[in-house]
Amino acid sequence: MGAKGITYKDAGVDIDAGNTFVKMIKPFVRATSRPEVISDIGGFGGLFSLNTNKYKNPVLVSGTDGVGTKLKIAMMADRHDTVGIDLVAMCVNDIVVQGAEPLFFLDYFATGSLSPERGAAVVKGISEGCIQAGCALIGGETAEMPGFYQDGEYDLAGFTVGVVDRDKIIDGSSITVGNTLIGLASSGLHSNGYSLARKIIFDTLGFGINDMLPGHDRSVADELLTPTRIYVKSVLNLLRDFRVNGIAHITGGGLLENVPRILPKGCKAIIRRDSWTMPEIFRILQNGGNMEWTEMYRTFNCGIGMVLAVPENDVDEVLIRLSGLQEKAFVIGEVAKCEAGTESVEMI
């Protein structure tokens, strides 16, 4: 009798583990469903029947993103149930700033060797993020690639599609001098600046993943794995009743790089640094890394996850509405005339 033939599992790809994984995630995926979803998990493509009668001139808005090296923290702590929320947040927050309602989401999960339990924890987080954002998880790809990743490592990418009526697109073009800038509080680092944060926390300060942070009642893992806040439902609620001229998602590049993305030519943002209290984790990073303020504001969100430009006359009512939506909001500055040769964001 000849030698036993080589199998796919011998090469490092376990089809049975993949099937187990799919069975484990089905209830999570189904919990995100919307009436427009007309397909089930396991098909070749996700089907979504858009009700165009709800819109005068619907425009689809797409976004894609990842979680970056925050995944390294999840692997160090062996906690994988929150990074999926981050994945959804990074995508849906990017499209809601244009006024779009997220409709559906897809994910890409790549790993060297599939652990059904670890993968299911990640997808559970993705499903939770979709529920928070009101969008359906209608598909995804799980890629098991032996030899491509170190043991226990994985990477994530997310993709979302939303819709907005053409005449309700928010692109910052209607921002004018005198508009007030309102900042929405972040939940922490969100999903940006982690390469620098890891260097300071672990290399410079010498903390371990389970150590308690100084002056904190939280561990390093608890703080660094706090999920990115999803602002979708609050922003969409606000847009139904108030005029918002521009919205910036404060991601990589911080306030200094993201606020200018929505400012029309001839406008600049004046932001008052003392208008909100910077969370302690940012103080720890700044002091631990001996960081200049400019570097802080172009690397981290520093406690502000989203910035809205609104007419000055609406500010009080907007703040009341945001408070009712459980958002911590601060008047952080205003839009001013930008003189030639000056920076588009002035921190004072």
UniProtKB/Swiss-Prot annotation:
ATP-binding as UniProt keyword: yes
InterPro entries on file: PurM-like_C_dom, PurM-like_C_sf, PurM-like_N, PurM-like_N_sf, PurM_cligase
One annotated GO molecular function: phosphoribosylformylglycinamidine cyclo-ligase activity
Gene name per UniProt: purM
UniProt cross-references to Pfam families, sorted A to Z: AIRS, AIRS_C
Similarity comment text for this entry: Belongs to the AIR synthase family.
Protein name in the entry: Phosphoribosylformylglycinamidine cyclo-ligase
Keywords: ATP-binding, Cytoplasm, Ligase, Nucleotide-binding, Purine biosynthesis
EC category: ligase
